Amino acid sequence: GSEMCIRDRSSPRLNVYSDQIVWGRSPVRIDMAGGWTDTPPYSLFAGGSVVNIAIELNGQPPLQVYIKPCAEHRIVLRSIDMGAMEVVNTFEELQSYCMIGSPFSIPKAALALAGFVPAFSETAYPSLEKQLEAFGTGIEITLLSAIPAGSGLGTSSILASTVLGSLSDFCGLMWDKNEICRRTLALEQLLTTGGGWQDQYGGVL
């Protein structure tokens, strides 16, 4: 649960030049057998085995994330497929990731796990603006999902993994694939949706 990730505080450090973009892309996954046997609490007691395959859509990874520096010390979130945008200026706004139905719950929770809220940060900052000032830039995250959430293709989990992996690159956190998948599980606990481990592993590995 969230205790796991609160112990793992992060110390994000800008890892790109001002004109660079981190571009993360992932396929989605299809269950062949064993769906939901990966989901706690069942998997904790009985173990779980899932066979799945990763697929692309029209030859393109259907889930894409772009992260780039932003001149102002704030966080800008955009969704191309939903035509939505939100500007985040405070820790409180960033911590609104458990609001059901928000198009930006996943990137907000991912930013939290990357160390951009006090509970997950190694360093205490008086405000998000001050933290981004110390970080050296604001952050703009753009999401593109060619497949709707709730499609049964693991979209939300894999989008979460893709955002976390891209943030790891952008912030020099050096998370490997196992760490990204572990934090995806933590992210889903933060969003209170819960979930197993096969979705993110099916798309990331």
Region spans (language model):
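ATP-binding N-lobe of GHMP and related small-molecule kinases
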Residues: 1-153, 165-177, 182
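Alpha/beta catalytic cores of group-transfer enzymes, especially the acyltransferase/condensing modules
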Residues: 175-205
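Acidic/polar active-site rim loop that often engages polyanionic ligands
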Residues: 162
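Short, conserved phosphate/pyrophosphate- and ester-handling motifs at nucleotide-, phospho-/glycolipid
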Residues: 156
